[in-house]
Amino acid sequence: MKETIRIIGIDPGLRRTGWGIVESLGNSLHFIGSGTVTSNAEMDLASRLCQLHEGLSKVLHEFMPHEAAVEHTFVNKDATATLKLGQARGIALLAPAQAGLPVAEYAPNAVKKAVIGVGHGEKQQIHMMVKVLMPRASFDTSDAADALAIAICHAHHRQSIVSARRMQALLAG
């Protein structure tokens, strides 16, 4: 018997961290919610990270997902910006882990391939396919749309992850 799994996808960013929640039952996907957690750019870094953590924690408490998926960040030429993005990504991994959720991570190309069929594509293609896959989906920012795409990617890949975890448990036990 198949069970409904509620998944939160998180698109980390220091200014805006997108979140999107879907329910997966077999091959069927249903939109639950999406949004963006923001931090105040005028505050110090530690305070901004606290804002992101508090915002994500509220979303997790409100929607009670079963699993989480976070996108890997890319390294750019600005080392300081990359480091700050990495710290925001740490919050995106920490909040669901603290809530007791298993957290999967996906490269941007894997997300694109799961949603649009190829590993390289434009954001507009991803956003359009999110709407095709879940016609009731709504998102107010690009970050929220990307987070929904991350959740969709996890819904497509989760069975192989679950099987691998079971195999590890059998080998360890």
From Swiss-Prot:
Active site per the UniProt annotation: 11, 71, 143
Any one Gene Ontology cellular component term annotated for this protein: Holliday junction resolvase complex
Pfam families named in the record: RuvC
EC number from the UniProt entry: 3.1.21.10
Chain sites annotated for binding Mg(2+) 1: 11, 143
Disulfide-bonded cysteines: none
N-terminal signal peptide: none
GO BP annotations, alphabetical order: DNA recombination; DNA repair
SUPFAM superfamilies assigned to the protein according to its UniProt record, in alphabetical order: Ribonuclease H-like (SSF53098)
Subunit structure, interactors included: Homodimer which binds Holliday junction (HJ) DNA. The HJ becomes 2-fold symmetrical on binding to RuvC with unstacked arms; it has a different conformation from HJ DNA in complex with RuvA. In the full resolvosome a probable DNA-RuvA(4)-RuvB(12)-RuvC(2) complex forms which resolves the HJ.
Protein name as catalogued: Crossover junction endodeoxyribonuclease RuvC
Protein's organism: Brucella canis (strain ATCC 23365 / NCTC 10854 / RM-666)
Name of the encoding gene: ruvC
